[in-house]
Amino acid sequence: MASGDFCSPGEGMEILQQVCSKQLPPCNLSKEDLLQNPYFSKLLLNLSQHVDESGLSLTLAKEQAQAWKEVRLHKTTWLRSEILHRVIQELLVDYYVKIQDTNVTSEDKKFHETLEQRLLVTELMRLLGPSQEREIPPLLGLEKADLLELMPLSEDFVWMRARLQQEVEEQLKKKCFTLLCYYDPNSDADSETVKAAKVWKLAEVLVGEQQQCQDAKSQQKEQMLLLEKKSAAYSQVLLRCLTLLQRLLQEHRLKTQSELDRINAQYLEVKCGAMILKLRMEELKILSDTYTVEKVEVHRLIRDRLEGAIHLQEQDMENSRQVLNSYEVLGEEFDRLVKEYTVLKQATENKRWALQEFSKVYR
């Protein structure tokens, strides 16, 4: 690639700042990396014009937003139906709990029985589904016509529906007041008018708090991204500092190693001398505990006598060695005379012993 295709450092820094301001993509790239790869920085900048912060393309993000809008709409519709269904079930449960303790009027009994009958038939018809879409036999062989026969009378249904609206409104009002007291316990002592006014504004308050939570989460996310970038930058700085410290330590160690070795040698020498003195002190302590002054004097006398005897024996041995040396001058003649003398001495001792034995016998 020609040298003119590269960007200058100033242009690279400008591109770097633009990419950092876009925060796209969420990766830990250092300034050096982006400056060394200016075309990659331009690619990120161009890419940021076609995608949002989550990485989706603008078209796909728009379709996703529309899809989420439809989902929320269907969810709202389903929640309304589910809330109404649960409120009706709670009305029936409260009714059956109530009749266990107190007597109810005929109108209440008729209202709840008609409501329960209508609810059960409606649920069964929903379970059966459209007849034209069924490919399998219906449950228990029932058809919608069979279920329509179980419907309450139209007059009873109209009367029940008119009262049901009031009952549902009253039940929902109780739930709203309960929710308000849970959110703001101080509202429990307020009148119904004040509670109704607070409930009317409760949705806006909750939406505002939800928005605050979302804003706080967004700020936290931004802070986390900033923290990750700073952590990456600080890690690089720490690595460089550690490398520098390691090099300085190695250089300083080479300079001071000889002095350190000399100090260690002196320390070991002094320590060995101290250990020898300590051993000698222990030895003297043991000797002083073992031998008294009288024992030491007796041992000194015995040693003097033994040394004198050894000296006399050494003198006798020296005299005998001199005599032997003088006899060795005679050579083989001296050896023959010594052997002859030995034989004669042995014969004399034998005869002396025999004479002693004879003398013992004759006595």
From Swiss-Prot:
Keywords: Cell cycle, Cell division, Cytoplasm, Cytoskeleton, Microtubule, Mitosis. GO terms for molecular function: microtubule minus-end binding. GO terms for biological process: cell division; centrosome cycle; regulation of microtubule nucleation; spindle assembly. It is found in: Cytoplasm, Cytoskeleton, Microtubule organizing center, Centrosome; Cytoplasm, Cytoskeleton, Spindle. It holds the Pfam family HAUS4. GO terms for cellular component: centrosome; cytosol; HAUS complex; mitotic spindle microtubule. Contributes to mitotic spindle assembly, maintenance of centrosome integrity and completion of cytokinesis as part of the HAUS augmin-like complex. Component of the HAUS augmin-like complex. The complex interacts with the gamma-tubulin ring complex and this interaction is required for spindle assembly. Interacts with EML3 (phosphorylated at 'Thr-881'). Belongs to the HAUS4 family. PANTHER family: AUGMIN SUBUNIT 4 FAMILY MEMBER, HAUS AUGMIN-LIKE COMPLEX SUBUNIT 4. This is HAUS augmin-like complex subunit 4.
